[in-house]
């Protein structure tokens, strides 16, 4: 017996061969198996119950496809691994620090194997049956097709992979890298191998079958008072003290007719003995038979077994943990699993038919059995050239494409984002992390801030930090346009300048259509006067103006004017003709020459009418011609006036000169031109109010420099610019103007620079959330998309989202990326946010899990954030290395301490390295506590 036990593992498998396109593993009883490695399609904590149902349907489809005489074995291996990331030698200091911080961090890896096994014929000798062999390969192919059709990632294992898989299972070693075998020592409680033990926990005690009466493919976990869909056994990813957990799930599909007859006979036996227990048993069996008749389900034999590897002294807490978690699911695991070695061997890959039917298997419906199958995978990194690293819910770095449009999987149409998070939610820390990673991947970033949140990272990357002050105000010349910009992109500039002028002139009020028309015309003519100075109207322009003014004149004509004009024409006809000198005739307009000719002809015709010798028909014809000529003379007199008016207009335009482009010259141009337009068009416009309101930005005004100083052209070449305008955030006039011209700077930069560009506006965006700016903001967002850009706004005020239609229409509706941080402070009004952002029930549930999980152990400061890209959303952790924290910090005390180290060591990188080394050497104090000590001594720690 002892000799037999020593060689017990030798007879597990008969053969491993590659045949007919499949690697087939034969058990000792001749049962062939093919092994797929798959990825469970449901991401842990996705909160979407429908995904669990869909995977349940896929597994049910596979069972129906393979049918009787087959077993489906699924093994989910949850093994502790050590994190490693290959960092390029030329990586930035903060990036190297980031991955060094996570190096070696323990995490749970999930690998899933799906094993299809054909039952061997029960006989003394194993015989080759070509039909069964072909059927086996056909079922493997159909299973492959189902997984492909349902978009479940999978692959068949090769020969070496199957061999390694079986050997690793025997050694129970699934950590990456080499592994070795060691001796086994079996007992009734567990198997001992080296310094670890392996224990089996069958989910079902065959003698009692303590399972819930109703079961679903998922369960609900209570988080913040909300039921969140999760896997029935999701707790397996967090079994304490374990280094490896294998959840072995086996379903055998027996002959259905034989089992049905057996159940029907059993129901009759129970019915023949009329006592309460038999009536209940009969009712249960009949319910099962009814289900089988109605639904596409089958009777199956099952075994579910959890194998755990842990130190010998941790068996009790591991057992207690599993029993508690299973009890919460309504499952009482077997307490009589004394056949530990047998259970371990039965769980080997391809051993789906090795279980003892007397005490290892229980009978149930296939739909119920599949509810116990593990369905989750952990969050994975995305395939994308633009990588933004966050952590998953267990603290493992994963990269995503934060734009949603640059990765292999396209999720968005634009990369614009909207971020909301209350004070203290980690909003600025998160944005610092995003900006760092964008900068390190060749993105030009322009930021508008109102609280020095980005001073540290701007200094680290040698960016340009422009802070507004009275001594050095932020000043630009938004009116300056190059000839090329004027010819190619004047429409955009014109709309921006209109928004700027109305922001000053009207504030938050809508401009009237007349005001919009006037300002639009002055801007167009202003640039036309600069780039194409006016000399004279062309013939075609004159004719067009003539027709326009003629229509306007007729529009205002009335009967009295007509009568008066006709009387005047009669006087001219009846007045004695004056002889004109030849030189004066040469100076006449064509219309004047025609007028004189018509008058002479009318006089001749009048003489004919008065001639007694003329016949009546001649007189009538002459009278008709006179009336015709008089109408022409009437029109001709209007044309003469119009021609003179056009001459006057021509002279006015000739006098309008623009020598340089600036607000000053536009102001002068507009004040001269607007009265001319209003007089011509006969419209009203309060030019005095307009002049008075804009005067403060004009020559000699308090804010003259704001719109009349050329911006440093070198700014367009800067990779990172931060505009800090906290000192004017309460100025209702200057604040929105400065924000607006900064946005214009970004648009110019975006057109000039190649590659990715990002404009991020923190709380300052509220300055431009006015009705007059709605169209411009929409335009900005749409234009950014065309030039490989990102426009983002960040806010912490709930009312900004709920109460502003501009936010919804101009910003949210044009932002395919939405970012939310902890929303518990907004819980009472969360329905309003959800409605405006268009959140689904699943997305709401995801948001409720932010910072609500018990996942802080062994991790430093971090906050969680919900990111939605198109329809794809998830919760991520924002956890950074200490070096990154020092670079991002917005705490004044910490910034002052860092400046002391900077003064000592010369470079910010060296200062960050030394201050973090000293903090750890001083006992790993909190950042703020250590900073206080540094500030107290006013010197670096080595000099204390």
Question: What residue ranges belong to the model's regions?
Answer:
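P-loop NTPase motor domains
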Residues: 49-65, 331-332, 344-398, 404, ...
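Flexible coil/linker segments and helix-coil junctions enriched in charged and small residues
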Residues: 87-95, 100, 123-128, 132-133, ...
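Short secondary-structure boundary/capping segments
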Residues: 87-92, 129-132, 171-172, 350-353, ...
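Short, flexible loop/turn elements at secondary-structure junctions
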Residues: 40-42, 76-78, 118-120, 310, ...
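P-loop NTPase motor core of the ASCE superfamily
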Residues: 101, 489-541, 805-944
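Extended, folded cores of ATP/NTP-driven motor/assembly subunits in large transport
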Residues: 1-374
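Conserved P-loop NTPase motor cores
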Residues: 396, 404-425, 429-436, 445-454, ...
């Amino acid at each position: 017996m002892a000799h037999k036990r020593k060689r017990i593992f030798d007879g597990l498998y008969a053969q491993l061969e590659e045949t007919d396109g499949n690697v087939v593993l034969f058990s000792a009883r001749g049962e062939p198996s093919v092994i797929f490695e798959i990825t469970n399609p449901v991401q842990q904590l996705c909160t979407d119950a429908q995904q669990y149902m869909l995977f349940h349907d896929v597994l049910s489809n596979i069972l129906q496809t393979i049918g009787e005489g087959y077993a489906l074995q699924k093994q989910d291996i949850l093994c502790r691994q050590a994190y490693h990331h290959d960092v390029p030698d030329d990586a930035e200091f903060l990036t190297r620090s980031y991955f060094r911080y996570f190096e070696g961090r323990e995490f749970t890896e999930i690998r899933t194997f799906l094993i299809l096994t054909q039952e061997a014929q029960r006989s003394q000798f194993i015989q080759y049956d070509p039909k069964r062999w072909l059927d086996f390969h056909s079922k493997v192919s159909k299973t492959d097709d189902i997984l492909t059709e349902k978009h479940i990632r999978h692959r068949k294992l090769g020969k070496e992979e199957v061999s390694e898989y079986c050997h690793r299972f025997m050694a129970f070693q699934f950590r990456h890298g080499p592994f070795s075998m060691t001796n086994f020592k079996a007992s009734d409680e567990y198997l001992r191998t080296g310094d670890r033990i392996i224990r089996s926990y069958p989910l079902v005690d065959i003698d009692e079958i303590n399972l819930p009466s109703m079961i679903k493919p998922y369960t609900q976990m209570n988080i913040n008072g909300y039921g969140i869909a999760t896997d029935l056994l999701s707790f397996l990813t967090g079994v304490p003290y374990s280094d490896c957990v294998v959840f072995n799930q086996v379903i055998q599909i027996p002959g259905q007719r034989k089992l049905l007859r057996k159940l029907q006979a059993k129901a009759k036996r129970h019915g023949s003995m009329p006592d309460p227990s038999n009536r209940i048993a009969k009712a249960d069996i009949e319910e099962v038979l009814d289900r089988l008749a109605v639904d596409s389900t089958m009777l199956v034999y099952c075994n579910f077994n959890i194998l755990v590897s842990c130190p010998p002294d941790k068996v009790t807490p591991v057992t207690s943990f599993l029993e508690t978690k299973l009890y919460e699911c309504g499952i009482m695991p077997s307490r009589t699993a004394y056949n530990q070695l047998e259970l371990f061997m039965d769980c080997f890959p391809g051993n789906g038919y090795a279980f003892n039917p007397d005490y290892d298997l229980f009978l149930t419906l296939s739909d119920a059995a599949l509810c116990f199958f593990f369905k989750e995978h952990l969050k994975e990194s995305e395939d994308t050239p633009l990588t933004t690293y966050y952590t998953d819910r267990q603290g493992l770095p994963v990269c995503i494409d934060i734009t949603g449009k640059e990765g292999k999987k396209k999720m968005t149409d634009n990369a614009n984002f909207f971020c909301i998070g209350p004070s203290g939610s980690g909003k600025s820390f998160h944005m610092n992390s995003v900006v760092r990673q964008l900068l390190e991947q060749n993105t030009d970033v322009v930021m508008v801030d109102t609280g020095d949140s980005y001073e540290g990272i701007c200094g680290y990357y040698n960016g340009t930090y422009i802070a507004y002050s009275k001594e050095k105000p932020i000043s630009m010349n938004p009116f300056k346009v190059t000839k090329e910009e004027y010819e190619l992109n004047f429409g955009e500039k014109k709309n921006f300048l209109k928004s700027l002028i109305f922001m000053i002139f009207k504030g938050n009020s809508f401009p009237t259509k007349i005001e919009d028309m006037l300002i639009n015309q002055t801007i167009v003519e202003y640039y036309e006067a600069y780039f194409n100075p006016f000399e004279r109207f062309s013939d075609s322009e004159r004719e067009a103006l003539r027709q326009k003014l003629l229509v306007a004149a007729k529009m205002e004509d009335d009967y009295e004017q007509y009568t008066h004009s006709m009387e005047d024409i009669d006087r001219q006809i009846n007045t004695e003709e004056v002889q004109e000198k030849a030189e004066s005739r040469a100076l006449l307009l064509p219309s004047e020459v025609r007028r004189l000719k018509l008058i002479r002809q009318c006089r001749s015709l009048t003489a004919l009418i008065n001639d007694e010798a003329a016949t009546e028909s001649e007189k009538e014809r002459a009278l008709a011609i006179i009336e015709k000529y008089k109408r022409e003379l009437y029109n001709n007199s209007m044309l003469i006036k119009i021609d003179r008016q056009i001459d006057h207009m021509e002279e006015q335009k000739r006098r309008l000169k623009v020598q340089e482009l600036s607000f000053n010259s536009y102001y002068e141009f507009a004040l001269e031109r607007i009265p001319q337009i209003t007089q011509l068009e006969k419209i009203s416009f309060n030019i005095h109010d307009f002049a008075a309101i804009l005067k403060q930005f004009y020559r000699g005004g308090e804010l003259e420099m704001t719109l009349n100083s050329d911006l440093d052209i070198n700014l367009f070449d800067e990779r990172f610019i931060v505009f800090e305008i906290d000192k004017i955030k309460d100025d209702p006039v200057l604040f929105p103007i400065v924000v607006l011209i900064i946005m214009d700077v970004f648009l110019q930069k975006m057109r000039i620079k190649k590659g990715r560009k990002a404009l991020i506006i923190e709380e300052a965006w509220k300055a431009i959330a006015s009705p007059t700016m709605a169209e411009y903001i929409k335009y900005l967002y749409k234009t950014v998309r065309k030039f490989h850009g990102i426009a983002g706004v960040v806010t912490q005020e709930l009312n900004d989202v709920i109460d502003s239609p501009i936010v919804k229409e101009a910003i949210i509706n044009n932002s395919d990326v939405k970012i939310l941080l902890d929303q518990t402070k907004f819980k009472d009004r969360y329905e309003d946010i959800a409605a405006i952002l268009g959140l689904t029930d699943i997305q709401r549930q995801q948001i409720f899990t932010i910072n609500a999980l018990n996942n802080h152990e062994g991790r430093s400061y971090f906050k969680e954030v919900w990111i939605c890209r198109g329809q794809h959303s998830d919760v991520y952790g924002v956890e950074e290395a200490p070096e990154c924290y020092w670079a991002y910090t917005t705490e004044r005390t910490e910034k002052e301490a860092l400046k002391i180290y900077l003064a000592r060591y010369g470079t910010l990188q060296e200062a960050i390295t030394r201050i973090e080394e000293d903090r750890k050497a001083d006992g790993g104090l909190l950042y703020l506590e250590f900073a206080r000590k540094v500030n107290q001594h006013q010197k670096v720690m080595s000099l204390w």
